[in-house]
UniProtKB/Swiss-Prot annotation:
InterPro entries xrefs: Ribosomal_bL12, Ribosomal_bL12_C, Ribosomal_bL12_C/ClpS-like, Ribosomal_bL12_oligo, Ribosomal_bL12_oligo_N_sf
Gene Ontology terms: biological process: translation
Entries under Pfam families matching the protein: Ribosomal_L12, Ribosomal_L12_N
SUPFAM superfamilies, sorted: ClpS-like (SSF54736), Ribosomal protein L7/12, oligomerisation (N-terminal) domain (SSF48300)
Protein species of origin: Aliarcobacter butzleri (strain RM4018) (Arcobacter butzleri)
One annotated Gene Ontology cellular component of this protein: cytosolic large ribosomal subunit
GO molecular function: mRNA binding; structural constituent of ribosome
Record text on subunit structure and interactions: Homodimer. Part of the ribosomal stalk of the 50S ribosomal subunit. Forms a multimeric L10(L12)X complex, where L10 forms an elongated spine to which 2 to 4 L12 dimers bind in a sequential fashion. Binds GTP-bound translation factors.
Alphabetized UniProt keyword annotations: Ribonucleoprotein, Ribosomal protein
Protein name per the record: Large ribosomal subunit protein bL12
Length: 123
């Protein structure tokens, strides 16, 4: 009596992960093949690239922290706002400091504000 594909699949489905790993290694040795993933075809790469990466980011202060004066100074340096506007932005959190900027700029502004003591999000 010959063993069918269904019998083989049923047997394999009953194996543990360790047993499956050993079985794969034995297949590789016996048949001289590798179980490495096959390279993705060109059409699939195009589909992955079709997913747009976000290009515009907003810098939002979630909390000014204990060092509000330093945070206000950084807000003024980043935005060019006057003292009152920068103070309002620091005190009325969450507040958006910059909108529609590049990821590099957003990360740089985030680092500046966090160094001054603020908790910042980039969205």
């Amino acid at each position: 009596m010959a063993v069918s594909k269904e019998d083989v699949l049923e047997f394999i489905s009953g194996l543990s992960v360790l047993e499956l790993s050993e079985l794969v290694k034995e297949f590789e040795e016996k048949f001289g093949v590798s179980a490495q993933p096959v390279a993705v075809a060109g059409g699939a790469v195009a589909a992955v690239e079709a997913v747009e990466e976000k290009t515009e980011f907003d810098v939002i202060i979630v909390d000014s922290g204990d060092k509000k004066i330093n945070v206000i100074k950084e807000i003024r340096a980043i935005t060019g706002l006057g003292l009152k506007e920068a103070k309002d932005a620091a005190e009325q959190t969450p507040s958006t400091i910059k909108e529609g900027i590049s990821k590099a700029d957003a990360e740089a502004f985030k680092a500046q504000l966090e160094a001054a003591g603020a908790k910042v999000e980039v969205k």
